[in-house]
């Protein structure tokens, strides 16, 4: 039985006890869920899109890293799914409370896509969970005359 099937069983068991599903923090489970989301033919596509949006823990969990990277792929137009537009992907990143989401937002802000760079910069201006390495990366880009980094700082 794979992790996703185990998660579904756990949800059913918890439901009988009057409990909601546990949040997802496992990177391996997140990858399985994202695989279902990527596959529009998967019978679990819709359910997994919902899990991706609502059940993955934010912050620095392994699931958050997988989610942030997948949202980056959506923003970079590598994947298109009905449930998450580019703007919705930015919104989801904005609520992830630091860690991997900040790295993705900085990648996008300092990237070559002008529109997405501006959107990422606007989200970064609202974030308070930046590590020293994140700030150092922005300062380095600023010193290299990156106008987006200047705008963020």
Identify what each model region corresponds to.
Residues 42, 79-84, 114-118, 145-149:
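Alpha-helix N-cap/helix-start positions at coil->helix boundaries
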């Amino acid at each position: 039985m794979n992790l996703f099937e185990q998660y579904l069983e756990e949800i059913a068991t918890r439901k009988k006890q009057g409990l909601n599903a546990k949040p997802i923090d496992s990177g391996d489970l997140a990858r399985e869920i994202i695989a279902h989301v990527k596959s529009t033919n998967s019978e679990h596509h819709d359910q997994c899109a919902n899990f991706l949006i609502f059940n993955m823990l934010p912050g620095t969990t392994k699931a958050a890293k997988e989610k942030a990277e997948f949202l980056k792929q959506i923003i970079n137009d590598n994947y298109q799914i009905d449930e998450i537009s580019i703007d919705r992907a930015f919104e989801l990143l904005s609520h992830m409370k630091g860690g991997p989401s900040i790295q993705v937002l900085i990648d996008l802000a300092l990237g070559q896509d002008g529109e997405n760079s501006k959107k990422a910069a606007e989200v970064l201006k609202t974030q308070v969970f930046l590590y020293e390495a994140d700030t150092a990366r922005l300062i380095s880009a600023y010193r290299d005359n990156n106008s987006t980094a200047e705008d963020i700082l």
